[in-house]
């Protein structure tokens, strides 16, 4: 079975400040099982000054551009932030496992407050979410190790059919739509009959979209 995906957006990270930082692999940062494959949120340490400079709440994104053959490729990862004032200004410490993803243990990167990230979890863990509806909230700490509350805003099933907030239940239905999700009209007033899922998470749902609520 495919992994269950949780897409997390931070509504307060609209135009995040971007700064150049020094990134170092540090033995103090322990690797977390699955962090390199996107199945866990890895840890990063910064000092309080850098955290305030970037207006970071919980998550930081590190991004580099590297040459691969004749192409330039962007590599980025998202991290859960922990404050440690032993870390120098404008420096970020990460695990050696995550440093491997960037191809170096000491490098420069662009850092900014995370806008969106995606985490994959095993389907058996996702059963804890079955029965929740669009608009419901849940604590993410136990599920993905992130100390935030998440609000469900949508999702899709294993065939790609989207959940609709205004359709009760979990069943697949074919209804007349005039707008998203499920249909994007080309003309004003255009309507089309489309297959969608109801607003309740079932075993057939493979992705949910969420926002951080405070």
Curated annotation (Swiss-Prot):
Which key words tag this protein in UniProt? Ribonucleoprotein, Ribosomal protein
Q: Name one Pfam family in it.
A: Ribosomal_S6e
Per the record, its GO cellular-component terms are: ribonucleoprotein complex; ribosome
Q: Which domain of life is it from?
A: Archaea
Q: Which GO terms describe its molecular function?
A: structural constituent of ribosome
Name the InterPro entries for this protein.
Answer: Ribosomal_eS6, Ribosomal_eS6_arc, Ribosomal_eS6_CS
Alphabetical GO biological process terms: translation
The family classification in the record reads: Belongs to the eukaryotic ribosomal protein eS6 family.
What HAMAP family does the record tag this protein with? Ribosomal_eS6
PANTHER family listed in its UniProt record: 40S RIBOSOMAL PROTEIN S6 (PTHR11502)
Its recorded name reads: Small ribosomal subunit protein eS6
Where does this protein come from, organism-wise? Saccharolobus islandicus (strain L.S.2.15 / Lassen #1)
Gene of this entry: rps6e
């Amino acid at each position: 079975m495919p992994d269950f995906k949780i897409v997390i957006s931070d509504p307060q990270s609209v135009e995040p400040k971007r700064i150049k930082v020094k990134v170092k692999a540090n033995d103090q940062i322990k690797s977390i099982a699955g962090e390199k494959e996107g199945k866990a949120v890895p840890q990063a340490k910064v000092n309080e000054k850098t955290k305030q400079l970037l207006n970071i709440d919980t998550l930081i994104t590190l991004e580099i551009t590297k040459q691969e053959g004749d192409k330039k490729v962007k590599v980025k990862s998202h991290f859960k932030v922990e404050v440690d004032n032993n870390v120098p200004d404008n420096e970020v410490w990460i695990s050696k496992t995550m440093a491997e993803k960037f191809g170096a243990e000491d490098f420069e990167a662009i850092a900014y407050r995370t806008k969106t990230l995606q985490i994959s979890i095993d389907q058996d863990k996702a059963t804890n979410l079955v029965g929740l509806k669009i608009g419901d909230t849940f604590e993410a700490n136990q599920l993905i190790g992130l100390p935030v509350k998440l609000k469900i805003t949508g999702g899709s099933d294993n065939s790609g059919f989207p959940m609709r907030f205004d359709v009760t239940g979990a069943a697949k239905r074919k209804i007349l739509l005039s707008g998203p999700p499920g249909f994007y009209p080309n003309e004003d007033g255009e309507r089309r009959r489309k297959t969608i899922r109801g607003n309740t998470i079932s075993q057939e749902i493979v992705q949910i979209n969420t926002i951080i609520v405070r």
